[in-house]
Amino acid sequence: MEVISASSLNPNAPMFVPLAYRTVEDFSDQWWNLVHSSPWFRDYWLRECFQDPQFQNDDAFDFDFDLDLQDEDEKERKEGKEVVSLGVLKWRSCGGGWAQAPRYVEKAPKFVKPKVSPRAIHQPR
């Protein structure tokens, strides 16, 4: 059997590289030697100088949002937080009497048979 390995893609097209990764700086040989030889410099550069292209818009995020929420939480804690036992209210309405079985009218039927009205089909001859 013959395997078809032809493709409709352009073989002469340049390789696709996303824009975020196209602007990579070309570092010198001295820099690469320093990164490989000095763990301190490698850690420093990754921690202080490296910027991941995925997280370029860090300025748009507000890191002080917790301070605003703390003020609102303190206000909410003081207002309307009285404890009410709902279980007591539920059992008071029972009355302590016997449980009543539901009446037949209230029960939903298990099987419902639709009432069919037979109609003659009139077809021309």
UniProtKB/Swiss-Prot annotation:
Cited InterPro entries: CID1/CID2 (IPR040414)
One cellular component term from this protein's GO annotations in UniProt: nucleus
UniProt induction comment: Induced by tunicamycin and osmotic stress.
UniProt keyword terms in alphabetical order: DNA-binding, Nucleus, Stress response, Transcription, Transcription regulation
Keyword Transcription on entry: yes
Localization: Nucleus
One Gene Ontology biological process: positive regulation of DNA-templated transcription
GO molecular function, one term: DNA binding
Listed name of the protein: Protein EARLY RESPONSIVE TO DEHYDRATION 15
Protein function: DNA-binding protein that binds to the NRP-B promoter to activate the NRP-B-mediated cell death response. Functions as an upstream component of stress-induced NRP-B-mediated signaling to connect stress in the endoplasmic reticulum (ER) to an osmotic stress-induced cell death signal. Exhibits transactivation activity in yeast.
Chief location of this protein within or outside the cell: nucleus
The organism's place on the tree of life at top rank: Eukaryota
